[in-house]
């Protein structure tokens, strides 16, 4: 699967943040927007830093990803340039990675084994950035498309809440 020494060969590269003076005046993203195809090369390398640990705490619901995203799996697929398969693995556990990947505080990166000894390892894998790129590229390349309900049953369901959990519940009831 992954190169277990990739983190030793490839330095961690963080996404560029917008200047603070600019960010305090709006509600836009903290990070600079960049075309996913432009950042794909960087993200391929960063995914190669994942060492596919024996016990990947990054996707454990107690310490890492609360959704249980299959992070080592899609990191390896991205590393090999298999964006369509990476998107499939990401969507297997996450209905809306295109916005959860931006809103999430990324406990997966804190739980990453490489974050334990940051000075020696260079820090955690940039999981959040990789997830954003998978989702963005999937939309731009037509791998993911809007999915309207196949048929209308005529029934109505009320979902309280417009956050990610409410939207995921509504999405599962619509299909």
Predicted regions and their residues:
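Ferredoxin-type iron-sulfur electron-transfer modules and their immediate structural context
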Residues: 1-156
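N-terminal Rossmann-like FAD-binding beta1-loop-alpha1 element of flavoenzymes
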Residues: 155-175
């Amino acid at each position: 699967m992954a190169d277990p020494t990739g983190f030793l060969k490839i330095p961690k590269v963080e996404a560029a943040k917008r200047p603070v003076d600019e960010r305090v005046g709006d509600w836009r993203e903290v990070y600079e927007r960049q075309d996913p195809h432009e950042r794909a090369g960087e993200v391929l390398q960063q995914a190669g830093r994942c060492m596919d640990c024996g016990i990947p705490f990054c996707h454990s619901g107690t310490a890492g990803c609360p959704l249980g995203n299959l992070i080592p799996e899609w990191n390896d697929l991205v590393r090999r340039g298999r964006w369509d398969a990476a998107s499939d693995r990401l969507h297997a556990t996450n209905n809306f990675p295109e916005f959860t990947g931006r809103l999430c505080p990324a406990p997966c990166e804190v739980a990453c084994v490489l974050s334990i000894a940051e000075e020696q390892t260079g820090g955690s894998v940039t999981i959040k950035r990789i997830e954003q790129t998978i989702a963005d590229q999937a939309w731009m390349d037509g791998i993911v498309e809007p999915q309207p309900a196949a048929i209308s049953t005529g029934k109505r369901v009320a979902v309280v809440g417009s956050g990610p959990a409410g939207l995921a519940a509504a999405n599962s009831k619509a299909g």
